[in-house]
Amino acid sequence: MMQYVLKNGIILDGTENMKPVTGHMIRIENDRIAEILPEDSPVSGCEVIDLKGAYVLPGLINLHVHLATSGKPPRANKKPTNYKRLFQILSRSRLVKFVLKRMLRGYARTELMSGVTTIRTVGGILDMDARIRDEINERKIQGPRILAGNTGVSVPGGHFAGSIATEAESPEQARVHVRQIASTGPDHIKLMITGGVMDASEEGEPGVLRMPPEIVKAACEEAHRMGYKVAAHVESPEGVRVALENGVDTVEHGAKLDDDMLRLFKERGASPVCTISPALPYAVFDLSESHAAPVAKKNGRIVMDGIIECARACRDSGIPVGLGNDVGCPFILHYNFWRELYYYHKYVGASNRETLYTATLGNAGLAGIAGETGSIEKGKSADLIVVKQNALDDLTDLRNVSMVMVRGDLIRNPKVKRMKHVDDMLDRYM
């Protein structure tokens, strides 16, 4: 592998109190950050890359990804997708699975090209996420580091039941499903505890508790026994309480919290993963833009407000908050994670510095990989991005990265295929 020296750049190292550092260069050896040294130090045997005053940051970490879908917006007058039926068709055809896997590889690569060097998937088709992870780890294909969730666990009638999540009807079935998922090589286990906006037909349904507490407890116990952390889809106060009381490690999305729930977060060492992106189009777009039913707009607002209130309350209480954008949901494309950072700053009230830390070293800590990535420090994986302006001043500068490095592999002038009409719609609500 090549060895590089990045010079004439301004370093934002991803640590909690990061500030622009000049006069230093970064030496990359194989897949590691070998050292950070004064710019006048002699170097040899390396390709020297002149950053010409650009900013170099740790690669972003997206904690809530669905590789199974593109994120394209729905078409007008289109019937809602029957995901369970679609999954049945996909799982029966080897040819369709082959084509689908190629698409998923492409989505993973798009994440990388946009500056996301690590993704955490939380609900996918069969074992495809882990297979793609392994192909990347074996350097058969190029992509971000993947922490794979594979298929999740739901209940009959629950969120994405029968598609990207199996259906458990009892605590013992939940244990069986967890063991079956574990046999496919995931990095964690995903549960679907409440309903969601996309499968709700009545106002308030996204937060309806679907998974009984005893099933949540059984699934968490089995996952923990096998060494896996548990992430759970939760969009109501009742769901948050059930999740925390029964062993969930990360509450994906969230809802309004009371003091007792905050106490549970602290006692259990749990954290929320803030995902404003998927709720925003439903909440703020005109129905002529979102092509959603009126009830989805109302539910989108309920969910968006709950996610923001959850993240804000946890942040104010000193509970670490993670960031993910639920990519794959309508309007949430695989190159737009930077928007979630902007929303976290705008709606939750975090400073740009805190937001950058959250999306890099903070997220790495929640994912259990802070010793490997998330900051520009000697010995860590060479996962870096370069942008022309200072993201501490304006987070939207993360929209366009001029260079990406993942595990020492350098990508110059990375390109993504954008959907301009979607970007224009989202830009109007920034």
Per-range role (PLM):
Residues Y55-E135, E214:
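Metal-associated gating/positioning segment near the N- to mid-region
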Residues R92-K97, L104-A130, G143-S154, P186-A200, ...:
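Divalent metal-dependent hydrolysis catalytic cores, especially in the metallo-beta-lactamase
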Residues K72-P74, D129, D199-E202, V240-N246, ...:
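Histidine/acidic-residue-rich catalytic or RNA/ligand-binding cores of hydrolases
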Residues R131, E172-P272, D286-H291, R301-V321:
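Histidine/acidic residue-rich metal-binding segments in metalloenzymes
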Residues T69-L100, N150, V155-A161, G196-R210, ...:
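Active-site gating loops and adjacent loop-to-helix segments of metal-dependent hydrolytic enzymes
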Residues M1-H24, E29, E39, L90-R92, ...:
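Active-site microenvironment of metallo-dependent hydrolases
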Residues R225, K229, P294-V295, D305-N390:
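His/Asp/Glu-enriched, well-ordered alpha-helical/loop segment
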Residues E39-L57:
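Active-site metal-binding motif and surrounding structural segment of the metallo-beta-lactamase
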